[in-house]
Amino acid sequence: REKGRLFDGRACVWCHGAEGKGDGPAGRFIRRYSAPRPRDFTRESYKFRSTPSGELPTDQDLFRTITQGIPGYMPSFHSLTEDERWQVIAYVKSFNSAFKEEISPPIPLPFPPHAPSDAAIENGRKLYQQFGCQVCPGENGVGDGPESRAGHLRDAQNLLISATNLADRSALKNGAGPQDLYRSIMTGFDGTPMPSYGGQFAEREQEAWDLVWYLLSLSEK
């Protein structure tokens, strides 16, 4: 019950609800008819993971999210001690029995094999076009792609979702560092139109870093 006390006492319950279904009294006003809404912990679809698409996040993934927060939506709970954060994580996991099963290991998350260069950024730009990324974030990555402008983007609950403005690093909800972007590209955001590109970059992970460098360059223009 101590774990639940922290969950209730730290305002988690106001957005995520007493039963962790994302239906707290404050949560319903965050974006009533569009995404993102507070996470429903009883579902097995999590956006921010280091595990393959379709898998639950690791404990470390949950710890990272609670510690860093989600820019524009959820505050950082760095004010909690590490032990208290782990207690909250244990309580969050209790809402879904699937967490009792063995969690898939995270994907490899290497350090960048090379520094950004004009050639790498140009190749990243070509990959951005090749994968059709421009239809959601747009040609310049500012979130104005045709699918987004037309209101065609929906999440798994059929809520309207807007493409991210990649030119604004503060809008990158899963982190804005090179490894954060690499992780997002390789795992995708389950429950959203953003798929995993791990399969496309199999055996050529180095090129994924070219895409990372291109995405980071968008915020420098």
Predicted regions and their residues:
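Sequence/structural segment immediately N-terminal to covalent heme-attachment motifs in c-type
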Residues: 1-18, 31, 116-142, 149-158
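Electrostatic cytochrome c docking/interface patches
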Residues: 1-8, 99-129, 170, 174-175, ...
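Short pre-active-site segment immediately N-terminal to redox-active cysteine/selenocysteine motifs
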Residues: 8-14, 19, 70-73, 84, ...
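Sec/Tat-exported extracytoplasmic proteins
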Residues: 11, 16-19, 66-70, 78, ...
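Short, solvent-exposed loop/turn and secondary-structure capping segments
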Residues: 17, 24-30, 51-53, 75-77, ...
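His/Cys-centered metal/cofactor-coordination and adjacent catalytic loops
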Residues: 21-31, 37-43, 99-117, 151, ...
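Extracytoplasmic electron-transfer domains, predominantly the class I c-type cytochrome c fold
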Residues: 30-78, 85-88, 92, 150-201, ...
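Extended surface/linker regions that mediate inter-domain or inter-protein docking
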Residues: 60, 77-123, 214
